[in-house]
Amino acid sequence: MASITLTPSEKDIQAFLEHYQTSLAPSKNPYIRYFLKLPQATVSIYTSGKILLQGEGAEKYASFFGYQAVEQTSGQNLPLIGTDEVGNGSYFGGLAVVAAFVTPDQHDFLRKLGVGDSKTLTDQKIRQIAPILKEKIQHQALLLSPSKYNEVIGNRYNAVSVKVALHNQAIYLLLQKGVQPEKIVIDAFTSAKNYDKYLAQETNRFSNPISLEEKAEGKYLAVAVSSVIARDLFLENLENLGRELGYQLPSGAGTASDKVASQILQAYGMQGLNFCAKLHFKNTEKAKKRLER
């Protein structure tokens, strides 16, 4: 029988209770605030703030709090470095890349914290747990600002080679701190052949072999940690850039980005967009066309 213990926020607890209020049941245990009988699982919410989920459906209900079961592979049970990036698909904001070093004895702590791929967690949950991860987990975070991104793209780098450079540098700097991984995993964003081709132009190199794996954030907690910290760094940068310009900058590259981009273009010109956006995205031309209407 699966058993999962979590310590979520009171706000998340209340949201869970509201969602499953019809499953509330009495409990004689004086230390249990709420007890729920759900299909294939029971949930005990203790006065201490801890939550115990038991049963075949425990993982399903734990995912409400951001818990993600990580695939148990032989590689997962090694001290390893995992890397991930956030921001490459967003017009506004910089490009954040993080390398994190995780050891097997940290796995329980990370799962109880609710660590998972940043794409499966709410921004609120990410902002809540990222500071804890930054304090407890050895990592190296890099942020390429939009203006610097625009400076290097089209000159020395393209959209793929710049990510190779950042992932390589994050790993290199983390290794310089003395960590000793038995494996290094990168959440694959290109082929190994392409990665090696672009890596050849980088100065800082290391001898450790690397593995590029698709959906690595669901297989390795080190990659999941990097995903969360990178998302937090990206969101913080997005907020700071927007604050300086007086606009709320949306994430992504949809029509909302086109609209805000046209407003910034009208107010500040191309200099304003260069400050906060990745200019080679199609959103730039769409923003210009909006002003021509």
Curated annotation (Swiss-Prot):
A divalent metal cation binds at D84, E85, D187. Its EC number is 3.1.26.4. The keyword Magnesium applies. GO terms for molecular function: magnesium ion binding; RNA binding; RNA-DNA hybrid ribonuclease activity. It holds the Pfam family DUF3378. InterPro entries: RNase_HII/HIII (IPR001352), RNase_HII/HIII_dom (IPR024567), RNase_HIII (IPR004641), RNase_HIII_N (IPR024568), RNaseH-like_sf (IPR012337), RNaseH_sf (IPR036397), TBP_dom_sf (IPR012295). Keywords: Cytoplasm, Endonuclease, Hydrolase, Magnesium, Metal-binding, Nuclease. It is found in: Cytoplasm. It is an enzyme of class 3 (hydrolase). It catalyses: Endonucleolytic cleavage to 5'-phosphomonoester. Its cofactor is Mn(2+); Mg(2+). Manganese or magnesium. Binds 1 divalent metal ion per monomer in the absence of substrate. May bind a second metal ion after substrate binding. Gene3D superfamilies: Ribonuclease H-like superfamily/Ribonuclease H (3.30.420.10), TATA-Binding Protein (3.30.310.10). The keyword Ribosomal protein does not apply. Residues 78-293 form the RNase H type-2 domain. One of its GO terms (cellular component) is ribonuclease H2 complex. One of its GO terms (biological process) is DNA replication, removal of RNA primer. Endonuclease that specifically degrades the RNA of RNA-DNA hybrids. Belongs to the RNase HII family. RnhC subfamily. NCBIfam families: rnhC. This is Ribonuclease HIII. It comes from Streptococcus pneumoniae (strain Taiwan19F-14).
